[in-house]
């Protein structure tokens, strides 16, 4: 999707649909930075005065610019606090975002720029107190500003302190991005990619640096190359206040903010309870400071306006003003301004240094080297016609006219019509009187001029930050990729474990079903065998009974026949008695046979019951054996499955270990490659910076050499003038002496005296001529030597400075490399400990599971045997109760019915 085409409803809701060029009128540039420009404007519908930050998202890094805009808009939308800038809305117009916010008079940095001296301690405390309230609000919502500095602490007309420029802010805490302005960066931000994450305490460090900035007009290390400052901050001790005139409370506050170790640094809430910000101070301290600054800005602008008027009059008269007249007027205004400035600001005795920190919202522009104030004294501006035109899609880059509420300075004298450009410049200083500001026109123009100039250092720092962010993205992308790979690996292993568990469960279910089927089959077979056994016994007993009955019949017949024979042989016994004896014998025989038959049936029944009981006992024992076999089979199966599971877990652990080591190696290799690339870039940047500084010094020396003849000529003319003055004096003295000698000597000696005086005058003039030539030669030699010595000293100083910066870079890179190697060693040791601990836990788990399995095996077998023993014991007791005795030694009949 093309950036700016709002198809996503969530993104579309971030922007208003109105045309900003129609809604806002009277746009005037009041600031500039790497992001674009900031404009003063008026809402055409409500007449509300606002500040508009224009940010283009076309050209290079379009996607990154668009994402930065979205992040800043989302960040600003959620802010609602008296000490944060009020968000009014955001509009889109032709690849440019119009970020509308409340208008503020200027920044704390502008106060330093206007007064050219540090602020008073009570003023610093008031500004710091307001900034701390804003930071406490941000930090309580897990937000980080990440670019706290004087240029981003704004002031309103009633003296309210506002935090601004959230382009570098983080919506998550902790964070680990390399962002911010070098001189104000906390050490953990500089080392973020190398050592880890940071939190809101980075803002506390930046606030401490800002306190030093307000107390000394510039942050520590500001005279150092920005890249070198980064290396210095990362590895050296925290800075402190230099002057001894600050109170102990202020010093403790700054030292507290600048604790090197983040864990020892206070939070914003803790700092709000510090004596430095809680002590009594005048309620109007900031209002008075703002008013004094506005007065000073007005005086500076009036001075510039008068300079423009001079140029106008000079052009009108077609000739320059009298030099002495101009100097006199300038001196008058300058003296007035000096008197005014001496009555403003701090009474500290800290030397006033012309340092331009600026109030740019961009974090990069604050890296500018100390600028010579004289370069921005004269400000060239265009008139209102090119500025107020709000219908054009792009406001002209020089539209920076200011308007004040107070009345302008009028001039009753009619002014001739000058040229357009000069007239516009003069008009600018009158129009600036229409709105309140604490930022002078020269400061705004200087910001624009600095931004328009090709700033190699700014581009270098932007490229360096971009590279660090890209490196971080690469690391995050690799970490995410490795995490996804590890998640996929673990998911695969988990699925394998689940599959094994499912398969094991299925196998156990199959085994259980198989065993149930076997038991059921055995039960059926046993029932059939028992029935068959019973039938066989019954059949045999029936057969035995039949045989027995037949035997009895035969025996009965034999006995009957035998008795009959005996009776027949005994003829003495009567027949009737014989009959009775035969009948009685029959009855006895039948009774005996009946008893024998009954006894046989009883024996058969007993035999049947006893053998059936014994058969049941055998079946029960066989069932017990099957149960034992089944439980052994089940337990053996479980053990086999558990051993397979353990082997699989060990294999998984080894594969995970191998993957973890490979991933750690890949991550550390990328990190080292990125650090090498970063160090190479830092070295190239430093070498490029060294060459640029040497080129600049060489150009300066060449200009000095080119300028030297003019300077020598001027000095020669000065010496010549001195010689001429001396000659004139001597000539006057000669005339006076000649007149005196002629008056006091006779007339006849006049000729001799005139000749003598003439010779003396000639001799003295010759001496003067010799002295003149000698002075010229000495001056020439002296100036040439002085220039050579000065240039050589400058070269030597530059070489020494660059060498120190290079040594600083090497030390920083060495430290980073050592820290990274130590980090890698810690990561490796941590991984080894984690792998070793995990393996120990796995082995312990395996031992515990095997022990639990063995315990389960023993308990289940024990319980089974005990149950079977109780069952047999109960069965035997029942058998004894039934009168069967010991069935263990019972022999089966020849036929095995089992």
UniProtKB/Swiss-Prot annotation:
Species name: Homo sapiens (Human)
Low complexity bias: start-end ranges: 352-362
SMART domains named in the record: S_TKc (SM00220)
Catalytic residues identified in the record: 147
Primary subcellular site in the record, as a coarse category: cytoplasm
The protein's name in its UniProt record: Serine/threonine-protein kinase TAO3
Record domain Protein kinase: where: 24-277
Annotated phenotype, changing residue 20 to T: In a lung adenocarcinoma sample; somatic mutation
Region (Disordered): 316-362, 405-425, 565-596
EC main group: transferase
Gene3D superfamilies: Phosphorylase Kinase, domain 1, Transferase(Phosphotransferase) domain 1
Gene that this sequence comes from: TAOK3
């Amino acid at each position: 999707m093309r950036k700016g085409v709002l198809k996503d409803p969530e993104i579309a809701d971030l922007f208003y649909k109105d045309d900003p060029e129609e809604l806002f009128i009277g746009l005037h540039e009041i600031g500039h930075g790497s992001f674009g420009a900031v404009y003063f404007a008026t809402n055409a519908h409500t007449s509300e005065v606002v500040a508009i930050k224009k940010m283009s998202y076309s050209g290079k890094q379009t996607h990154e610019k668009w994402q930065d805009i979205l992040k800043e808009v989302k960040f600003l939308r959620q802010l609602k606090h008296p000490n944060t800038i009020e968000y009014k809305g955001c509009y889109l117009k032709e690849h440019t975002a119009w970020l509308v916010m409340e208008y503020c008079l200027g920044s704390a940095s502008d106060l330093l720029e206007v007064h050219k001296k540090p602020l008073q301690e009570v003023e610093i405390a008031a500004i710091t107190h307001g900034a701390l309230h804003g930071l406490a609000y941000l930090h309580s919502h897990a937000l980080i500003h990440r670019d706290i500095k004087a240029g981003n602490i704004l002031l309103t007309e009633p003296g309210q302190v506002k935090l601004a420029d959230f382009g570098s802010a983080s919506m998550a805490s902790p964070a680990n991005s390399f962002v911010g302005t070098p001189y104000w960066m906390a050490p953990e931000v500089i080392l973020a990619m190398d050592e880890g994450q940071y939190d809101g305490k980075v803002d506390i460090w930046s606030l401490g640096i800002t306190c030093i900035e307000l107390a000394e007009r510039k942050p520590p290390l500001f005279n150092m190359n920005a890249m070198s400052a980064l290396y210095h901050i990362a590895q050296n001790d925290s800075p402190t206040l230099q002057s001894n005139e600050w109170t102990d409370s202020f010093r403790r506050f700054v030292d507290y903010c600048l604790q090197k170790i983040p864990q020892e640094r206070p939070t914003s809430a803790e700092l709000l309870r510090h004596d430095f910000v809680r002590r009594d101070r005048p309620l109007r301290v900031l209002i008075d400071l703002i008013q004094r600054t506005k007065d000073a800005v007005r005086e500076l602008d009036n001075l510039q306006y008068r300079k423009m008027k001079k140029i106008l009059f000079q052009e009108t008269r077609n000739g320059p003003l009298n030099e002495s007249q101009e100097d006199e007027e300038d001196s008058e205004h300058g003296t007035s301004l000096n008197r005014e400035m001496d009555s403003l600001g701090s009474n500290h005795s800290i030397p006033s240094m012309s340092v331009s920190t600026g109030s740019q919202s961009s974090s990069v522009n604050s890296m500018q080297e100390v600028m010579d104030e004289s370069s921005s004294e004269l400000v060239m501006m265009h008139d209102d016609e090119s500025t107020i035109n709000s219908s054009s899609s792009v406001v002209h880059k020089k539209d920076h006219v200011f308007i004040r509420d107070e009345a302008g300075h009028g001039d009753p004298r009619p002014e001739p019509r000058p040229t357009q450009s000069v007239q516009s410049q003069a008009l600018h200083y009158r129009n600036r009187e229409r709105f309140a500001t604490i930022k002078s026109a020269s400061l705004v123009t200087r910001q624009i001029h600095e931004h328009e100039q090709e700033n190699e250092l700014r581009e270098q720092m932007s490229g360096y930050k971009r590279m660090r962010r890209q490196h971080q993205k690469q690391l995050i992308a690799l970490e995410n990729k490795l995490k996804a790979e590890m998640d996929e690996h673990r998911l695969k292993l988990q699925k394998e474990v689940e599959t094994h568990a499912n398969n094991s469960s299925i196998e156990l279910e199959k085994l259980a079903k198989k065993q149930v089927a076997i038991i059921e089959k055995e039960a059926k077979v046993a029932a059939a065998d028992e029935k068959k056994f019973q039938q066989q016994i019954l059949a045999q007993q029936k057969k035995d009974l039949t045989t027995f009955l037949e035997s009895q019949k035969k025996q009965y017949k034999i006995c009957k026949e035998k008795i009959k024979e005996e009776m027949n042989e005994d003829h003495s016994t009567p027949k009737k008695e014989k009959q009775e004896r035969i009948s009685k014998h029959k009855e006895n025989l039948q009774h005996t046979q009946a008893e024998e038959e009954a006894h046989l049936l009883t024996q058969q029944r007993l035999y049947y019951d006893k053998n059936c009981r014994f058969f049941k006992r055998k079946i029960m024992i066989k069932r017990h054996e099957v149960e034992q076999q089944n439980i052994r089979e089940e337990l053996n199966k479980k053990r086999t499955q558990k051993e397979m599971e353990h082997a699989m877990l060990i294999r998984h652990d080894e594969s995970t270990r191998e993957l973890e080591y490979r991933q750690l190696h890949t991550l550390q290799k990328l990190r080292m490659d990125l650090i090498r690339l970063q160090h190479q870039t830092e070295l190239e940047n430093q070498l490029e910076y060294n060459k640029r500084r040497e080129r600049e010094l060489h150009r300066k020396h060449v200009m000095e050499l080119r300028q030297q003849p003019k300077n020598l000529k001027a000095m020669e003319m000065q010496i010549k003038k001195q010689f001429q003055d001396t000659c004139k004096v001597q000539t006057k003295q000669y005339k006076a002496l000649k007149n005196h000698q002629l008056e006091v000597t006779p007339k006849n000696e006049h000729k001799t005296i005139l000749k003598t005086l003439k010779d003396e005058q000639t001799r003295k003039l010759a001496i003067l001529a010799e002295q003149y030539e000698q002075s010229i030669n000495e001056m020439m030699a002296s100036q040439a030597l002085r220039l050579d010595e000065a240039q050589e000293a400058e070269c030597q100083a530059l070489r020494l400075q660059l060498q120190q910066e290079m040594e600083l870079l090497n030390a920083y890179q060495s430290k980073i490399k050592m820290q990274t190697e130590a980090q890698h060693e810690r990561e490796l040791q941590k991984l080894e400990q984690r792998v070793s601990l995990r393996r120990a836990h796995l082995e312990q788990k395996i031992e515990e599971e095997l022990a639990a399995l063995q315990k389960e095996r023993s308990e289940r077998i024990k319980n089974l045997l005990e149950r079977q023993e109780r069952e047999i014991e109960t069965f035997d007791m029942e058998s004894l109760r039934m009168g069967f005795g010991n069935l263990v030694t019972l022999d089966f009949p020849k036929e095995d019915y089992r």
